[in-house]
Amino acid sequence: MTKSELIERIVTHQGLLSSKDVELAIKTMLEQMSQCLATGDRIEIRGFGSFSLHYRAPRVGRNPKTGQSVSLDGKFVPHFKPGKELRDRVNEEEEGEL
């Protein structure tokens, strides 16, 4: 699902909200979450999951075109850990499809 598809779904389910209002709310929420992670903070949405940063250590990679070894610096990458309610819901729906 893309951001625009999410906006359309919310507008469809919540008839009182305009598309522009939903778009602004989602953009604001995502911007705030990005800023929070950029400062090293953790985000927890109970029942859904948590977002945090994990450190990826420096390593030697490979250029896929040339096969040449390349030194990659260490960096922080965003990480999502689903909450129990989300995991349970996904598993219930998955079992229903089988």
UniProtKB/Swiss-Prot annotation:
Listed Gene3D superfamilies: IHF-like DNA-binding proteins
Key words of the record: DNA recombination, DNA-binding, Transcription, Transcription regulation, Translation regulation
CC annotations in GO: chromosome; cytosol
Pfam family, one: Bac_DNA_binding
Organism domain of life: Bacteria
Presence of the UniProt keyword Transcription in the record: yes
Entries under InterPro entries matching the protein: Hist_DNA-bd, Histone-like_DNA-bd_CS, IHF-like_DNA-bd_dom_sf, IHF_beta
GO function terms (MF aspect): DNA binding; structural constituent of chromatin
GO biological process terms on file: DNA recombination; regulation of DNA-templated transcription; regulation of translation
Family in the record: Belongs to the bacterial histone-like protein family.
Function: This protein is one of the two subunits of integration host factor, a specific DNA-binding protein that functions in genetic recombination as well as in transcriptional and translational control.
NCBIfam families xref list: hip, PRK00199.1
Quaternary structure, from the entry: Heterodimer of an alpha and a beta chain.
The protein, known as: Integration host factor subunit beta
Gene label: ihfB
